[in-house]
């Protein structure tokens, strides 16, 4: 009777390792597809994955083929057209250099793009890869938690670069000893019997021959046990581990004045939802302060920030003054990493824009690690943008970007929060 032992460790997910390798190999194409898909779905929809499309041309495997030119010697079966040492003319074309010309297909046949589904975790990992809070520094109180990759023992699945040779050979030795223990014991007994039989009188040649055949058969069976098996392989394992880091607070300032139409407000909300997902995905215990403003500013909770219908005129400085008050009351700059993200359509009372410049330059920017401003408009820039441009030229911790339509949101977000390298 034959016995089949299922040693697959992935269960139903038999191709988990191949899937991870595929995601790594085509990461740039997948990220491009995600950046296009994010504008077609609700950003708050994180409970599901995403269907990703990759052009077939991008996943074609490299292949070797005969090039044009050169001399080749081949042996062909005989026929009535050629005799020995005849030279055959080279056929025209070939070598993959066709003209590519031809008539269009009437039935529309062709190769579709390769489409596959990624999970929620894979979607968020790719969405926020290589992003980080800028200028984050350790302070006295360490309440915020950041996730980093750490060694976590060994795993039976992985990529060749992470293979542990020593651990794999240890497993190989243990498996071979376990699988051949009974046969080696029997072999030792047969060898002892053969040695004793050699000294007996009279000689028992037939019995000696039988023992030698049994010993040879056992040695063949032991030798057939493979030296290394996929079951023996062990790879260095890495896992995301929470690490204490500096505590931080993010101020979200959103303009909800009458000049902000519904489409502009929706784009601002999408930006802030991306920011919220980024913070909650990559950091723990980050305080988020929501401030809505028109002629007056008010600190609100998350629900009111995203869904309140209140509107009015526009005085941007009211939000900046309120932010300063909150910082003074609750967030000591010596103990907190303070960040701010402001979204507006740029429309502001003309006399208020210089005041915004003054508040930022003298009070807020010296206290914050990073201040980002996004202006959502298709019109030409007004006084607020021009005042902020002078701040950008003066302060390294101030950044500003322009969003014209929905397709700009994700690229602008990545530009504002991309992970800084040593050279920056």
UniProtKB/Swiss-Prot annotation:
Coiled-coil residues: none
Residue segments, region Disordered: 53-111
Biased composition (Gly residues): 92-101
Disulfide cross-links: none
InterPro entries linked: UPF0229 (IPR006698)
Comp. bias intervals (Basic and acidic residues): 77-90
Superkingdom of origin organism: Bacteria
Family affiliation: Belongs to the UPF0229 family.
Family annotation (HAMAP family): UPF0229
Protein name as catalogued: UPF0229 protein ECA2349
Originating organism: Pectobacterium atrosepticum (strain SCRI 1043 / ATCC BAA-672) (Erwinia carotovora subsp. atroseptica)
Lineage of source species: Bacteria, Pseudomonadati, Pseudomonadota, Gammaproteobacteria, Enterobacterales
């Amino acid at each position: 009777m034959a016995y089949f032992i299922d040693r697959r460790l992935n269960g139903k997910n038999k191709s988990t390792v191949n899937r991870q390798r595929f995601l790594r190999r085509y990461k740039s194409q997948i990220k491009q597809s995600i950046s296009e898909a994010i504008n077609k779905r609700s950003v708050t929809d994180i409970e599901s994955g995403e269907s990703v499309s990759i052009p077939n041309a991008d996943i074609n495997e490299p292949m070797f083929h005969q090039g044009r030119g050169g001399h080749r010697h081949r042996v062909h079966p005989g026929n009535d057209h050629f005799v020995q040492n005849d030279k055959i003319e080279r056929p025209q074309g070939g070598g993959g250099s066709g003209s590519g010309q031809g008539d269009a297909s009437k039935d529309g046949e062709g190769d579709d793009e390769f489409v596959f589904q990624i999970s929620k975790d894979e979607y968020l990992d790719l969405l926020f890869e290589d992003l980080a809070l800028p200028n984050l520094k350790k302070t006295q109180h360490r309440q915020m938690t950041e996730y980093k990759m750490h060694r976590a023992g060994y795993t039976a699945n992985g990529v060749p670069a992470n293979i542990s040779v020593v651990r794999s050979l240890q497993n190989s030795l243990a498996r071979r000893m376990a699988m051949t223990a009974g046969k080696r014991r029997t072999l030792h007994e047969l060898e002892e019997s053969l040695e004793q039989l050699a000294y007996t009188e009279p000689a028992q040649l037939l019995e000696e021959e039988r023992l030698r055949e049994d010993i040879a058969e056992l040695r063949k069976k032991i030798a057939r046990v493979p030296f290394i098996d996929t079951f023996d392989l062990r790879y260095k394992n890495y896992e995301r581990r929470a690490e204490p880091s500096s505590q931080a607070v993010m101020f979200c300032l959103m303009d909800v004045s009458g000049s902000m139409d519904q489409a502009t407000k929706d784009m601002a909300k999408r930006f802030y939802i991306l920011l919220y997902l980024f913070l909650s995905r990559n950091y723990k215990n980050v305080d988020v302060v929501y401030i809505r403003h028109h002629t007056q500013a008010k600190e609100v909770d998350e629900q009111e920030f995203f869904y309140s219908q209140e509107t009015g005129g526009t005085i941007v400085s009211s939000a900046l003054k309120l932010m300063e008050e909150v910082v003074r009351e609750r967030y000591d700059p010596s103990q907190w990493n303070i960040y701010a993200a402001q979204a507006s359509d740029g429309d502001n009372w003309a006399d208020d824009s210089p005041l915004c410049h003054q508040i930022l330059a003298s009070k807020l920017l010296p206290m914050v690690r990073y201040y980002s401003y996004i202006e959502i408009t298709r019109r030409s820039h007004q006084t607020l943008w021009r005042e902020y441009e002078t701040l950008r030229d003066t302060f390294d911790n101030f950044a500003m970007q322009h969003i014209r339509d929905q397709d700009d949101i994700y690229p602008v977000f990545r530009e504002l929060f991309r992970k800084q390298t040593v050279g920056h």
